[in-house]
């Protein structure tokens, strides 16, 4: 399994729509960087956030109650205030169409990590298609700003030595084609 370079990421995005919209260079002046890098792509977080609150005493991933969240639109302010020790969901500006022979792994940006803001995203499986739901945790005891429409994490692409027998699309992945922030789902 090989790590893919900028030239491959660019080709797959421009010719096959792997990342859309696609920024062909790294943008980093006066913003948290995003766009193409040497061996990855820095994704941007949108302006819609879902803050987990304490309306109910329990989060159950098998029976998730959307009333446990508050939707926040940060498009006017340009940022979202994540309270101390809080958790929120967001989504990428970019839409992904993964090739059948490629898996992507997403890692948080050091700019946020050095402020105690941890970003988690599960792997983008072969033939996954959709916007990416991003999990954001503020591990500090202070409120923190998360900037809308700026970089939030970096995606690296690993191409397999052979094509998988069954992709995420083939097995009817429950988050296939997701748009916006997608809450936990259990197939029934």
From Swiss-Prot:
Q: Which Gene3D superfamilies match?
A: 2.70.40.10
> EC number(s) on record?
3.5.4.13
Q: Which reaction does it catalyse?
A: dCTP + H2O + H(+) = dUTP + NH4(+)
What keywords is this UniProt entry annotated with?
Answer: Hydrolase, Nucleotide metabolism, Nucleotide-binding
The annotated pathway is: Pyrimidine metabolism; dUMP biosynthesis; dUMP from dCTP (dUTP route): step 1/2
Q: Nucleotide-binding among the record's keywords?
A: yes
GO biological process terms on file: dUMP biosynthetic process; dUTP biosynthetic process; nucleobase-containing small molecule interconversion
Where does the sequence pass through the membrane?
Answer: none
Which InterPro entries does this entry report, sorted A to Z?
Answer: dCTP_deaminase, dUTPase-like_sf, dUTPase_trimeric
| Positions that bind dCTP | 109-114, 154, 168, 178
Q: Which residues form the active site?
A: 135
The keyword Hydrolase belongs to this UniProt entry's keyword annotation: yes
Give one GO term, molecular function aspect: nucleotide binding
Q: Which PANTHER family match?
A: DCTP DEAMINASE (PTHR42680:SF3)
Q: What does this protein do?
A: Catalyzes the deamination of dCTP to dUTP.
- Protein family membership: Belongs to the dCTP deaminase family.
Its subunit composition reads:
Homotrimer.
Protein's name in the database: dCTP deaminase
Organism, as annotated: Helicobacter pylori (strain Shi470)
